[in-house]
From Swiss-Prot:
PROSITE patterns: THF_DHG_CYH_2. The lineage of its organism: Bacteria, Pseudomonadati, Thermodesulfobacteriota, Desulfovibrionia, Desulfovibrionales. It comes from Solidesulfovibrio magneticus (strain ATCC 700980 / DSM 13731 / RS-1). NADP(+) binds at residues 164-166, 193. The gene is folD. GO terms for biological process: L-histidine biosynthetic process; methionine biosynthetic process; purine nucleotide biosynthetic process; tetrahydrofolate interconversion. The keyword Transcription does not apply. Its EC number is 1.5.1.5, 3.5.4.9. Belongs to the tetrahydrofolate dehydrogenase/cyclohydrolase family. Homodimer. This is Bifunctional protein FolD.
Amino acid sequence: MLLIDGKKVAAELRQRVKNDVDALVRQHGRAPHLAVILVGEDPASQIYVRYKEKACEEVGFVSRIWRLDGGIGQCALEKLITELSSSEDIDGILLQLPLPKGLDAQRCLALVDPKKDVDGFHPENVGRLSIGLPCLKPCTPFGVIKLLEYYGLSPAGKRAVVIGRSNIVGKPMAMLLSAASPFGNATVTVCHSRTPDLAAVVREADFIVPAIGKPKLITRDMVKPGAVIVDVGMNRLPDGKLCGDVDYDNLTDVASAMTPVPGGVGPMTIATLMSNTVEAYRWRRQPPDCPI
């Protein structure tokens, strides 16, 4: 079985971003500037933001984190996002999700300048992704595609099953896998909590992308020999260990290629965030042919 090593691929992508940043500083006189908004004390969000801050330092970005009290009002949060969107000094904006109860994430995301939407969640970027126009792509699905590209695992003409229909992973993942591109062109099925006989659907798949957050949901009997599995799930077991949505240890002699958890998709999410921020920096200076 081929181990799809997200740590290795992410490290190479971060190095390319660092090289790009060095060139951009020489050309324009400053590095990309990423603004991160963290609301509340969610432990997982705190960890993710620290990882992102460290990655920014490694590639040479300027980053600033706005740490806001969980009791902040909707109007105050929207005011900050609007100010950052209009600032000439900010190239990318990341609103760390989830937000505390009482705050409307969709309203906030819609206020981010689409050209600075490095998470790819703004409705304009989502719409452009759906019709194949240049856009900033959601980081985790984009990271999955980057892994497939690196290892030459093309889903073109194959059956792909995405398990989960979230706006962050499932839906954009399905769009990227079915897109008319070298590492798209798959026939995609999206499964969710109302899908009858999930095992039967997954068993037909050549590419399996679980992103639902249920430990070891995908078992040996659900996977046909030779399938490629990219596990987006991240779950903490009672003993403190992390695992994905796939029963990894019992599938190594069934799958032809598979990501580990941790060390698979997670590092790619942060690396593609860095890549998106460089893209946003460039687009603010020279928009693509179909500008955002």
